[in-house]
Amino acid sequence: MNEVIKTMLDHRTTRSFVKGKELPKEHLEQIIASSKQGPSWMNGQHYSIIVTTGETKQQIADLIRDKAPGNAAHIENSAAFLLYCLDYTNIKLAFDIEGGEFDISNQHEPILIGTLDVGIAMQNAALAAESLGYGIVYCGGVRGFGDKISELLNIPENALFLCGLSIGVKDEELSTEKVKPRLPDAANVGYNEFPKSNVEVLKEYRQTMVDFAEERETKTWTKKFADFYAQPSGIEKVTKELLEKNGFVSEKER
């Protein structure tokens, strides 16, 4: 097994970082370069990366602390917190150069295209950081504070931040996370046809996760997601408002 695959298979979320550590400049540059080198739709690169450190990173942590103390803690203690934005501002500039009126608010594909580009870029950054020995944790919950964070970071129309990535030096004394079992292939891998998952497969995985006994989980895997998707999530309202405000959803779609 080569080192790239080993790093990928050894992935575990890290929420406990050694506070006060900074990323060496060359490591941050390597992580960003790796992130940007990922493939993107038509090479459109429909994303932006906001690197937050120091006071700005602290401001983000302070903004969310009351409602999301766990996320605030890992952001505060991380060496850097990278915010990834779905971004069509450069495409808007392309329209300015070539002529024509930029408006994607009546289209559905741009959101999917940009979200895919963001996901690929983020995973490249995560893999690069882990290959350098750092811990990482994705943070989608910051979308629940989208209006405040957008104002803090001057995120303009035609851009929308989707997710954050905390990177830092792992605090091995406090870290309890282990390599988490994934769904069996029967649930989500198919060869020449769609996978044939079933209730028994998911019941077995539910028991696998019970046996794994992650401390932070209070529900079984099936119960957690049956509850989560039974109604709109807590950040649905903020996400909808930002999609509308930032030009991703038209009046007709509303």
Language-model features: locations:
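Acidic, surface-exposed loops and disordered segments
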Residues: 1-254
